[in-house]
């Protein structure tokens, strides 16, 4: 991943923090305001989809993919995880997560993973425990139910 893409990812997360912390009143009429207002908690779908769109708008060749993970009770017990469902972005072969720190077991505010770090490990463990990871296109208007 290029330094410029990394810079844009970090800048985007900073913009989400700013919007949620000091400008949320300006976003109140936005359809997904409830998600943004709780950032980073419960807004992985919003953050991932909006990041993917932002990256694609800046460079149409990137083609980011949204990955929705769902864990099992066995996974949560075995790994003492608080994750039930989570959404991340894959771009240029890298996993990107702006909200992983919403879960007690993770502290990093931005995770950019070449598949050998925490996100790659998380996906392998979810699959190994019978959970799912579904790839989909960018969906700005939808949210997780």
Spans of features found by a protein language model:
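A structural boundary/capping signal
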Residues: 1-145
């Amino acid at each position: 991943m290029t330094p410029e893409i990394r810079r844009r990812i970090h800048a985007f997360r900073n913009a989400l923090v700013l919007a949620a912390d000091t400008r949320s009143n300006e976003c109140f009429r936005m359809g997904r305001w409830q998600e943004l207002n709780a950032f980073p908690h419960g807004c992985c779908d919003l953050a991932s989809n909006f990041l993917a769109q932002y990256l694609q708008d800046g460079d149409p060749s990137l083609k980011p993919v949204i990955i929705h993970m769902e864990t099992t009770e066995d996974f949560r017990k075995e790994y003492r995880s608080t994750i039930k469902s989570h959404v991340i972005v894959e771009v240029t072969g890298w996993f990107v997560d702006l909200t992983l720190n919403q879960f007690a077991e993770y502290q990093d505010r931005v995770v950019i993973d070449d598949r050998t770090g925490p996100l790659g490990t998380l996906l392998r463990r979810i699959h190994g425990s019978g959970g799912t990871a579904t790839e989909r296109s960018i969906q700005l208007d939808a949210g997780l139910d």
